Curated annotation (Swiss-Prot):
Belongs to the NPIP family. This is Nuclear pore complex-interacting protein family member B3. The gene is NPIPB3. Residues 252-262 have a biased composition (Polar residues). It is found in: Membrane. The lineage of its organism: Eukaryota, Metazoa, Chordata, Craniata, Vertebrata.
Amino acid sequence: MVKLSIVLTPQFLSHDQGQLTKELQQHVKSVTCPCEYLRKVINTLADHHHRGTDFGGSPWLHVIIAFPTSYKVVITLWIVYLWVSLLKTIFWSRNGHDGSTDVQQRAWRSNRRRQEGLRSICMHTKKRVSSFRGNKIGLKDVITLRRHVETKVRAKIRKRKVTTKINHHDKINGKRKTARKQKMFQRAQELRRRAEDYHKCKIPPSARKALCNWVRMAAAEHRHSSGLPYWPYLTAETLKNRMGHQPPPPTQQHSITDNSLSLKTPPECLLTPLPPSADDNLKTPPECVLTPLPPSADDNLKTPPECVLTPLPPSADDNLKTPPECLLTPLPPSADDNLKTPPECLLTPLPPSALPSAPPSADDNLKTRAECLLHPLPPSADDNLKTPSERQLTPLPPSAPPSADDNIKTPAERLRGPLPPSADDNLKTPSERQLTPLPPSAPPSADDNIKTPAERLRGPLPPSADDNLKTPSERQLTPLPPSAPPSADDNIKTPAERLRGPLPPSADDNLKTPSERQLTALPPSADDNIKTPAERLRGPLPPSADDNLKTPSERQLTPLPPSAPPSADDNIKTPAFHPQRMIISRHLPSVSSLPFHPQLHPQQMIISRHLPSVCGGRFHPQQMIISRHLPSVSSLPFHPQLHPQQMIISRHLPSVCGGRFHPQRMIISRHLPSVSSLPFHPQLHPQQMIISRHLPSVCGGRFHPQQMIISRHLPSVSSLPFHPQLHPQQMIISRHLPSVCGGRFHPQRMIISRHLPSVSSLPFHPQLHPQQMIISRHLPSVCGERLRGPLPPSADDNLKTPSERQLTPLPPSAPPSADDNIKTPAERLRGPLPPSADDNLKTPSERQLTPLPPSAPPSADDNIKTPAERLRGPLPPSADDNLKTPSERQLTPLPPSAPPSADDNIKTPAERLRGPLPPSADDNLKTPPLATQEAEAEKPRKPKRQRAAEMEPPPEPKRRRVGDVEPSRKPKRRRAADVEPSSPEPKRRRVGDVEPSRKPKRRRAADVEPSSPEPKRRRVGDVEPSRKPKRRRAADVEPSLPEPKRRRLS
């Protein structure tokens, strides 16, 4: 027999009934006894146990289970009722209600004194329970047993957290937990427990108010002594919420420890304030001091300044110890006020003082701040030297007569009146002084132009012989006095924008004149092509045999004018023009050869209404010429880094020749008859354009990307090469563009016109953006490039000429041959090539980007070939339009060609054909044989699905103003019925439109003629095996037939 003893300790009995059952089942898992009896035993144990101290581990109950070897179960349970009764008595006497305070314990004792059989109320659950003899242990804590255990564990964890937090704080600050802090922590715990009791309504109503008062005072005292947060009107509920979760009730051991605190200070005794103590001033917060404290010697140190509502008595050291904001009245005068008193306190003027015994000293201006003086100081001899600049905000008193060195010592901007003249003014006077007009001085000498800046003189200077040598460039911003009669070379020697009248001629002008002079035409010279920049020449150079070798590429952008023989050192000695200089004139007829500076501000401009002539002017970037009547603007080189808002705005600009425009430059004109030789920089901003209403001729202009010519009347635009990296919004918009000759267009450029009878020699790039276009309503003629002066022919042009030179057209050469399409780029030909028999073989695909020569009269299907939105009237019909014209080229009519053949669909990409090609005898040789070629030829060709990049979207209509619209030339909107399509789209027929006679009738069985015998089903034996086709092997196939290769789209 095996004896098993189970010791029921308080830790074991602290579990609830279900957990006790599980643990006992684990211990007696091998016992073969009825489960009902074992459950009864466990329930009895659970009903009779109670938490408390274990008596040195001595057993309360012994469960003795005997196991006989013969597998007969004899279970003997000895329950000593005396031990159970003793445990009940001990539990009730030592811990009648765990976690309660003295008030709760007294209430519990009163309930215990009731007789058995009565009903009582549990203090935790507020439920009525029975208290008859023999069942007193299970009446109180069976239901709330687990809640007590969780509350106890939570209290321990919270206490550990608070202690850890305080210790961590002290550890960071280099402190340890002292006995004083431990005492404060215990008092805080007691405060939380009392708040818990008040929250649960466990205190009688008669003691609640006193407890609330005690909580408030204890919180205030705790805050003052510990520095923790304090709320003056803290209630128990608010305190509980601020302290976190519901605090647990104290355990028996803790309540025994802290009973002394609760017994020493009952809540009923805290109805009156505590007696005063010596350390009240330290522990009481300053908010409780509603009356001022009596004066003390150390008030200034210990009392905050906001509590002092009345001014303090004067003291000798007030200026040092008292803050200036507390002084509501001015202080008495003192000798050292200027040194020790800060300037903020001098809000009121100082009282008048006695007359000084000593005269003013030289250091008075140093000690007194100038802003604190409401009246000027007496004059002093050394004011100009020792007085700071702030003092001179007030006018100075009259002083001694000025001396010769006054201009050096006194700044000119602080003088209200002009100074007397002096002999050395021009040498010693700073530049700031000349902001005011100068008094009349001695007659000017020859070196006045050097010493005095010209822009600060209100009157003109007399002429001088050495002006060109010694005068700085700033002087030329003011007009010169009248001089000798002008000569022919005045425009060369002096910049025109700085002269109201021409200067007299001089013999040494060619040597000593700045480089602005060279902006006008020079005399011809043999070495012009090397030494003279091409942008400053107005006429073409004479022909030379070595032009292709020695001429730089920049020269061929503009035609060179004939000029006088230049000097060799002209380009070296010319100074540059200042960037932020403007010429504002109403009558300026001509602006030529204007170079601009790269770092000019965008708002710097030349504003002129009438600009008749500005020669040799070198303009800087971000300079604008705004003119209403500007007849001629020639040789205008612009800098490439120009701001996009920099432009030349003109209403009447008849001729702009040889102008070299840089990026971010616009010419906006209403009447601009000719704009020639305008090279643009490739990195131009998309908003840079030439806007003109009347631009009859633009010749030889080299346009770079992001440049636009917007014109209503643009008769001729020739020689316009565009850069391949053009922005999609860059375009040439014209309503009347009669002639565009020799234009070399790069990708992202289109010419969209409604009436475009002829556009020749316009090669387009295959990678053109859909939004790049030249929009024109009237473009009657676009033919080959025009030249002002063609170059002489040369045999080695194609070999030795650099690529830049070919931006201009070549001179006429020998008659064209049959292979010209291969050797010469098509875009550089002025006229169409003669037909050739081997065009289909030798001509590269780029050739087909140029239009063909004029063809036969137009046909009826032209509306299909040309987009309808770009035509005001239909083009003349042509028989072979559908065959050989590429899609890009169909903006212009095609010339007549040979009749189409049947194999054109194979040789030509389908997207460029509107109709089939004529058959050819050598199709079988050039085209790889396909097994299904005949079948595919009979089937209708499947249209190819176009990509988004290949489709040409309709041009976005530009918003026009009312004044720009010409009602007479406004195209009429054509309806769908007006367009005559060559292949009409089949209409959808209705049921009523179909002829019922053509509808095949369904034949019935009776209508079938029985004379035709029904085919009989044949058997396998009836089939002739000899007629079955045999499967050929690889060896049987004839190798003579080449295997068809897979063709690519290209």
